[in-house]
A protein has these predicted regions:
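Conserved P-loop
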Residues: 2-78, 125-132, 180, 187, ...
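Structural motif
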Residues: 8, 90-92, 117
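Short amphipathic alpha-helix with an adjacent loop that forms part of the alpha/beta core around
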Residues: 78-85
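Conserved P-loop NTPase "ATPase switch" module shared by AAA+ and STAND
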Residues: 87-99
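Charge-rich, solvent-exposed alpha-helical interaction surfaces
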Residues: 200-207, 222, 226-227, 236-239
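Charged, low-complexity interaction regions
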Residues: 210-218
Length: 245
């Protein structure tokens, strides 16, 4: 008991997370470890086709990587796999962010002595944590944050950007609705800039009030005007003092 470990490959879309997971699967298989790959039921992007990596294919019947047929289990909740993991040494889970019970069963299985290797996103296209990731991350022994390539300028990319206007947190898609971007590209959209700065200033105002025992209440319209007039480069204290009701 309590001898397992949790390893997590993360980063933006198109950052090679699943490739790292699959390579580990093959290495562990060669070492005669009993391996199980768990995939998310509703992620059917790659059914009967080749993924980002031409070595990797998924059909409704099997998962193949570098000509190795993998032991796979497809489910919507990790609880569905709880009865079968005892037959395996190492559990691999792809797209971990989609499993609502991820933090519960990753911890449970690691406590049972299983090594757990994960691949997936930490944050949404709005750079907010996926539901449950705040509970999972503190349980992990090792995290690798991989980068992708910004499609706009070739720089290292650490953020995922959605290219349509849908605001739902979970929309499963590929390069038809997502792209990997660097910080500069992420902030090229004025709506994104204003939204993020408003959130930062609001949080800063709460901290400032707590620190100074004050009760400043921000006028959002004034804050927007202040942000734009100062071209996003300003002293936050000046902003909250000039833009309170």
């Amino acid at each position: 008991m309590f001898s397992g470990k949790i390893k997590f490959y993360s980063g933006p879309m198109f950052g090679g997370k699943s490739n790292l997971l699959m390579n580990d699967y093959i290495k562990c298989s060669l070492a005669k470890k009993k391996c199980l790959l768990i995939k998310y039921l509703e992620d059917n992007r790659y059914d009967n086709c080749i993924t980002h990596d031409s070595n990797y294919s998924v059909s409704k019947d099997k998962v193949i990587y570098k000509n190795v047929i993998m032991n796979d289990f497809i489910c919507k909740y990790l609880m569905e796999a709880d009865d079968i993991i005892n037959g395996y040494d190492i559990i691999f889970i792809d797209e971990i962010q989609f499993f609502k019970d991820n933090f519960i069963f990753c911890e449970k299985w690691a406590n049972q002595g299983k090594d757990i290797i994960l691949a997936g996103l930490i944050s949404t296209f709005e750079r907010k944590l996926f539901s449950g990731m705040d509970k999972l991350i503190p349980l992990v022994e090792y995290i690798n944050i991989n980068s992708a390539v910004c499609i706009d300028n070739g720089n290292e990319a650490y953020f995922s950007m959605r290219t349509n206007n849908d605001k739902n947190e979970t929309i499963i898609g590929d390069d038809d609705i997502y792209k990997a971007v660097d910080r500069k590209t992420y902030y090229q959209n004025d709506e994104v800039k204003i939204k993020n700065y408003l959130e930062m200033i609001n949080e800063f105002n709460n901290i400032y009030n707590a620190k100074n025992n004050t009760s400043n209440k921000l006028n959002i319209d004034k804050v927007k005007e202040f942000i734009i007039s100062n071209n996003f480069n300003f002293n936050f204290i000046d902003c909250i003092l000039q833009c309170n009701n």
